[in-house]
A protein has these predicted regions:
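Extended, subdomain-level signal for the structured scaffold at the beginning of enzyme domains
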Residues: 1-105, 109, 118-124, 129, ...
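Catalytic, metal-anchored helix/loop core of enzyme active sites in primary metabolism
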Residues: 113
């Protein structure tokens, strides 16, 4: 895995309530593969992480604001889950627009657990094959997605996964997909 993403800039979009392991483990996999990761959020400072949505799990430092971010500055996007995190993102027009523009750019986008709620809000799931946490699958189907119950679903530039239990497979898939789709070339700047 080391070096596959050398020079790549990966945006991680998350808000308060992010599931800690769903941000931490994919970020570690991307960093180990040579990517540079930047945490974008709705406010500066730090975001509050959770374990299983209920327990305080510390904080993450925010690197930039999504309202000031440009898709052109990044090679790939990661959308971690947690229930509260995507619920906050999906009502913020700058976050929704950033996700929509990212998917439409053809650059790779990865999302896990409840993270696909933000993809749904961005209007980019119709006709796509995705997986997610079971409780949002009806929402995805109602938005026109084909939903599968698999560790990882890859459809073009979208990579989705179900839950923290699937993190090893998800981390492998995002590194492989980001590298295969050109994120490893580090073209953003």
């Amino acid at each position: 895995m080391a070096g596959e993403l050398k020079g790549a800039r990966v945006a991680i979009l998350a808000a308060d309530g992010v599931e800690r392991v769903e941000l931490e483990q994919p970020r570690q996999a991307l960093d180990q593969a040579g990517a540079s990761t930047e945490l974008l959020s709705l406010h500066d400072g730090q975001i509050q992480a959770r374990n299983n949505d209920l327990d305080d799990a510390g904080t993450f430092d925010v690197d930039g604001l999504v309202r000031s971010a440009s898709v052109a500055d990044y090679d790939a996007l990661l959308l971690p889950g947690g229930t509260v995190n995507p619920d906050k993102l999906r009502v913020d027009q700058s976050a929704v627009g950033f996700v929509r523009d990212f998917v439409e750019s053809g650059k790779p986008v990865a999302s896990i657990c409840h993270g696909p709620w933000t993809l749904l809000e961005a209007g980019v799931v119709s006709g796509r094959t995705l997986t997610s946490f079971p409780s949002i699958r009806t929402d995805l189907r109602n938005a026109g997605a084909t939903v599968v119950d698999e560790e990882v679903a890859t459809d073009g530039n979208l990579v989705t996964s179900r839950s923290p239990d699937d993190l090893p497979a998800f981390c492998r898939a995002i590194v492989e997909t980001f590298a295969r789709t050109g994120a490893g070339a580090g073209g953003a700047r």
